[in-house]
Amino acid sequence: GLQATFQDLGITAADLARFPDYLVCIPPDRNDAPENANLMEMLSSGLPVKVLVQTSDLLEEASIGTGRFAFGVRSARLATAAMGLGGMFVLQSPSANLVALRAQIGRGLACRGPALFSVFAGSPRSASHLPPYLSAAAAMQSRAFPAFSYDAAAGGNWAARFSLENNSQPE
């Protein structure tokens, strides 16, 4: 069966334990889908859900009344809003910076509570003359989508919990 397949691939029980119990992936074209309207409520529930929200537009409408971005906040502010809920791991980063944040991503996946990963995938080629990877890097350098992580379990104060990773001039 399935267990034999995992064994054939050399995947151990310890390897499987590293995967999240619940993984929700929301691609850029589904950010405004009605089923995502309760994302913040789900994150604040304490369930061990890991949520990856990708966005490709930093300038979208933020109003719930417009039917855009069902989370109720602009994509560039989603991670900041989630930090305000407390009690979870939050990581925001452009796709161009994800390899540099692999240790933080691992911590977020390993945490026992909820985690939000908000990733700017870059602007589509039709919106920019740059490949999406380069527009994502430019968004970080310009501070339009800075990289940071917030780990509520990392300590008793903001200095221990919050980190600006790899941003130019983080002060």
What function would you assign to each model-found segment?
Residues 2-3, 11, 62-80, 132-151:
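Acidic, Ser/Thr-rich peripheral helices and adjacent loops at domain boundaries
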Residues 107-171:
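Glycine/aspartate-rich loop-and-adjacent alpha/beta segment that forms the canonical ThDP
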Residues 1-65, 76, 80, 89-103:
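Thiamine diphosphate
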Residues 64-70, 89-95, 134, 155-166:
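Noncatalytic linker/hinge segments flanking ATPase motor cores
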